[in-house]
UniProtKB/Swiss-Prot annotation:
Its cofactor is heme b. It holds the Pfam family Cytochrome_B. GO terms for cellular component: mitochondrial inner membrane. The lineage of its organism: Eukaryota, Metazoa, Chordata, Craniata, Vertebrata. Component of the ubiquinol-cytochrome c reductase complex (complex III or cytochrome b-c1 complex) that is part of the mitochondrial respiratory chain. The b-c1 complex mediates electron transfer from ubiquinol to cytochrome c. Contributes to the generation of a proton gradient across the mitochondrial membrane that is then used for ATP synthesis. GO terms for molecular function: metal ion binding; ubiquinol-cytochrome-c reductase activity. Belongs to the cytochrome b family. It comes from Sorex shinto sadonis (Sado shrew). The keyword Transmembrane helix applies. Heme b b562 binds at residue 83. This is Cytochrome b.
Amino acid sequence: MTNLRKTHPLMKIINSSFIDLPAPSNISSWWNFGSLLGVCLIIQILTGLFLAMHYTSDTMTAFSSVTHICRDVNYGWLIRYLHANGASMFFICLFLHVGRGLYYGSYMYLETWNIGVLLLFAVMATAFMGYVLP
């Protein structure tokens, strides 16, 4: 009798994606940081959009708009703290992801490594524009 998870069309997709995943047997927790970067980036984008809905950049009203977010907006304090701590978590995951690549010798794949370096520079430039300059 054949196994249902290998014959049923829907279960076959789930089986090949989750159960019989074509991954090396020596994969470790260091390989999770790429997906954690994606989660952190999605959190940053969503919380940044919600904060931008209520923030004003005028020098006279900027502080009062931040207090408005924390006091008057439903869960505004949580959105603000998620955005602030999400940025720190993003960079921690980013540096651990790069460190894993250095440790395992991923710099030998020049095209992939150079694209990663360009993305790192773009992230650092974006962080500079959004954090240091305002």
